[in-house]
From Swiss-Prot:
Biological processes per GO annotation: protein refolding
Species classification: Bacteria, Pseudomonadati, Pseudomonadota, Alphaproteobacteria, Hyphomicrobiales
Superkingdom of origin: Bacteria
Record's protein name: Chaperonin GroEL
Entry's Gene Ontology cellular component terms: cytoplasm
Annotated organism of origin: Beijerinckia indica subsp. indica (strain ATCC 9039 / DSM 1715 / NCIMB 8712)
Amino acid sequence: MAAKDVRFSSDARDRMLRGVEILANAVKVTLGPKGRNVVIEKSFGAPRITKDGVSVAKEIELADKFENLGAQLVREVASKQNDAAGDGTTTATILAASIVKEGTKAVAAGLNPMDLKRGIDHAVEAIVADLKANSKKVTSNDEIAQVGTISANGDKSVGDMISTAMQKVGNEGVITVEEAKSLETELDVVEGMQFDRGYLSPYFITNAEKMIAELEDPYILVHEKKLSSLQAMLPVLEAVVQTGKPLVIIAEDVEGEALATLVVNKLRGGLKVAAVKAPGFGDRRKAMLEDIAILTGGTLISEELGIKLENVTLAMLGRAKRIRIDKEATTIIDGAGNKDDIEGRISQIKAQIAETTSDYDREKMQERLAKLAGGVAVLRVGGSTEVEVKEKKDRVDDALNATRAAVEEGVSPGGGVALLRAIKALENLPTDNSDQKAGIEIVRKAIQTPAKQIVDNSGGDGAVVVGKLLESNEYAFGYNAQTGEYGDMVKLGIIDPTKVVRTALQDAASIAGLLITTEATITEAPKKEAPLPPMGGGGMGGMGGMDF
């Protein structure tokens, strides 16, 4: 077992604090509308330029192992905040650094660390209650656009695009961010349910110019096994022909005689038909087929459920307004499923999302949820260089997460104002002793730092501005760092999602409280390099007379 290096009390805390401050100083420059960039060296490829707090924090690894302990713990704050709210990572880091700094000073002065932590936790609870009480529900698309704009560092086009995407696919819809191949940033919306399986044969194409099969008002047969013969299906096929409507078959596979028969029927004009493979694999395929059946108001034809192909009737087939199939994807538009059944399925998937521990499973379930709930929007981020595209994509990701958080828990005045106003909630908080009071005082100081840092980054004097803001009793009165003017932050469109502010403070206080109450740190002792063996003396024989 490797030897360990152990440090105690103030020596341990001070060295961790140095690491915390190094990380916080690198992250805090990115905060606010005039936040600066951080350039990160990559072991291969071009350097990365970003204004995203968590991306900066994740890159920091310090040489001193004790300093690195502190840096890694605060890095955890940024990561946790990113997972919980997707934005506000810089704010969380600044808050954590401030609480750790003031808390370490207090412990060095002889205050009880456990009482300090209780005071900090008490203060955080009071502030969270205040934030929730003053949170304003997001109702208009303009407000959604404003939240997106603020999180994208003042880029209005990004805010507007996210607002449009949410309008199109609903709050439950999936919005993904991809890198575009062009200079422009654009929004692509796919309405209805789309899955990544195309037609099984080009003979099913109805529009030769666009190379797609479009079927209006079709019947949909959803079958979980392979189809190699159509013999068992003849009764239902004949029933569909009688109606004069097209038929779409979604099955594990359609092959051999079955596929040939369908193609011949299509070419002769007897039956308008198209066949596609079922999406997904294994259990996920079955779940997606059930989703399709519920969305279209049909029944999944499965022998496990005791339904055989020969017994299928028209009533068991799904319906949709239109189905569009190209080489790689199938889109079902306006499925005729029962609204209550679809809502029930959505609730079921939401419950599964809440229970799953796998990020991959969660992502796939969220995709299924969106497809049932109404659509998928893709934001394609463009730019003239790869570095620019990556930097912009970071901002768009943040903006998207912030707007989702705003829809969930409402909005508060931005620019650090919501936390400043929460100082009132700390007045007259009951405490058991003076050390707990000191813990509350530490939080009071910390919640002023985000507003101060935003002003400092914009070239102003943070302490002066914060002093002026605290003199006012108006809840939304704040400082617009973009223009250098004071005013009502909500009217100016400078708003933050309440969830982002709340989780930033909670995550910061959680880790900072642990750092303050640390009494010993253990790291691996640096290995002593063994001295190199002496070089053999005496020179090499037989080298005399050589001319160099």
